Swiss-Prot record:
Gene giving rise to this polypeptide: gltX
SUPFAM superfamilies: An anticodon-binding domain of class I aminoacyl-tRNA synthetases, Nucleotidylyl transferase
Protein's organism: Roseiflexus castenholzii (strain DSM 13941 / HLO8)
Name of the featured protein: Glutamate--tRNA ligase
GO CC list: cytosol
Enzyme class, spelled out: ligase
Catalytic activity from the UniProt record: tRNA(Glu) + L-glutamate + ATP = L-glutamyl-tRNA(Glu) + AMP + diphosphate
Enzyme Commission (EC) number: 6.1.1.17
A biological-process GO annotation: glutamyl-tRNA aminoacylation
Cited function: Catalyzes the attachment of glutamate to tRNA(Glu) in a two-step reaction: glutamate is first activated by ATP to form Glu-AMP and then transferred to the acceptor end of tRNA(Glu).
Keywords assigned: Aminoacyl-tRNA synthetase, ATP-binding, Cytoplasm, Ligase, Nucleotide-binding, Protein biosynthesis
Amino acid sequence: MGVIQGPVRVRFAPSPTGYLHIGGVRTALFNWLFARHYGGQFILRIEDTDEKRYVPGSADDLMASLRWVGIEWDEGPDIGGPHAPYVQSLRYEAGIYRPFVEQLLESGHAYLSFTTEEELERMRAEAQARGVKAFRFRGPERDWPLDRQREMAATGRPYTVRLKTPTEGVTAFRDLVRGGERIEFKNEELYDIVLVKSSGMPVYHLAHLVDDHLMRMTHVLRSDEWVASTPYHVLLYQAFGWDPPAFAHLPPILRQDGRGKLSKRTDDVAANRFWERGYLPDAMFNYLALQGWSYDGYTEIMSREELIERFTLDRVQPSPARWNPEKLLDMNGIYIRRLTTEQLVDAMAPFLARAGLIGNPPTPDERAYLLQLAPLIHERLKELGEAPELLEFFFRDVTDYDPQALIPKKMDASTTVAALQAARDRLASLEPWTHDRLEAELRALGEELGLKPGQLFGALRVAATGRTVAPPLFDTLAALGKPRTLRRLEAAISVLAAAHAEVKGQS
């Protein structure tokens, strides 16, 4: 890309029609990185002109999702700015779009169309019956004088405002993601799109373009699904006599199997779902930056500062990116392991509180205990949301032992009960209760009993935690403390002895 003249201004303009799709976060991120790389401004604008699909509260949700990832805006609905308001419905109510509609009508670049939806459906069906592959509507009113159009409107007949597209020649633009390649559309293959609905509300094609011009956008970075609409936008810029911004259409993100794009309807791709599951903002930021962009083909872990410094559009690939949840999970694990113990405790505390294991916020004693527990799972953790399940037995008693899980390989119930009783007796007098003393005593006990470490330690692990997989045994016992460890050994011995007695009684 050539040298950029003047301050860069870009925007992310989502529609509040539900949760924010992770692909939308990627689009916002690319805009944000582009603005920050060139020292420009990133603007957030809410495009809520589709009344039928509007979902109350979704604008707040999408702003929260962006802020969670670490994307802040320089101007926007909640912080204002020199071009406020930044919500299209409010701009419509303020009458911002009306003079531009009049300008298009007066210049002959738009017209009032009185064709109803029912008539359009009939025309489509008739065209299909004739074997027409693509129905391209051009209303008869496009050739009427404006006075005649206004006279018809004065009778009360509903109408829309449509763009009067040319029927000859081509409309073209250059795309920065494709190296400035010139993309052409034959005008004869266009149709007269609606600019203003019968309700008077401008549609996306008109509203976003007027807003981009008034807000002085220099570049438009958006999904490549808008490539087919761009010739209409170019025609509108020409009709107004405005210079268009530079266009950059970003590659889609495909499902992991490559079969189609990520979809709100069929894929678990709500940005807030990753927040809820315990993905770190820095990990998500880093991973999304690599969805369609690459620095050198192999460097993947990059800080925000490095991404800002390195991000340019000539490194955005026009070919589709592919979503890889396993790679994202691994990257999240890398970022979790980079946290200090204190940072990990702060990060996982809300998840433990939500599970009812600690208070919100944690008490000083709870926080001190978490500082002891966090190192036990730090290396294993890939989602913060896993922390409650991994740590639950430290906060709640084990109540449902599986007798079979208590019995190690090549041992039976009787020998396991004897081993656990011996461990209980040895540990009852152990002081101090530390990792090193626990390890020394239990290893010595195992040798005395003629057991392999895996046998004794396996039985002790299940007795202490109720699980076959848990953090390192001696760290776990040290963190549980002596009284709780001894109580759990007693409980496990009782469960296993009772199960053994029942089996003997049946034989």
